[in-house]
Amino acid sequence: MANYLPITMGIGRKARSAHSDSNINEIKQKVFERDDHTCKCCGFKSQKYQDVLFKNGNASDTKAENMLTTCIFCHQCFNLDAVSEMRSGLLIWLPEIQQYQLHHLARAIYVARISQGPMADAARRSLDVLMGRREEAKERLGTDDPRILSMVLKP
């Protein structure tokens, strides 16, 4: 198994930073460069579709050693409240694979769905199989909505 940081479901704390938007973007770019534009949780490498995770959960603590590059899929797991705001995900029950593996699968499905022909058809069928796992999440967690889970997780 790859040596990735564990992905933990959670909610983000809002930043109360003295940094301007351009300052924080500059800091983020330095972190991305330091991490070679590679997600520390799944290994996905891209100059786009990355964000930073604050190791201590405090988005106001913008020291480089507190920040890690994460892809947008991994980042959303740590910030379930943002998932519901962006309407970009839902909860499924899929214990057979690791979360980071699901993220690689989701990216592949996303890319294949925008193509034409057999690849797109296979991607749609794969997505249908994953969506079928929502019911198990509802049974076990009481919901498949990240917003509801994020509300339960709030202190």
Question: What are these language model-derived features?
Answer:
Residues 1-15, 76-155:
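Extended charged
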Residues 73:
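Alpha-helical segments that scaffold the active site and NAD(P)H-binding pocket
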Residues 24:
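Active-site recognition of the HExxH zinc-binding catalytic motif
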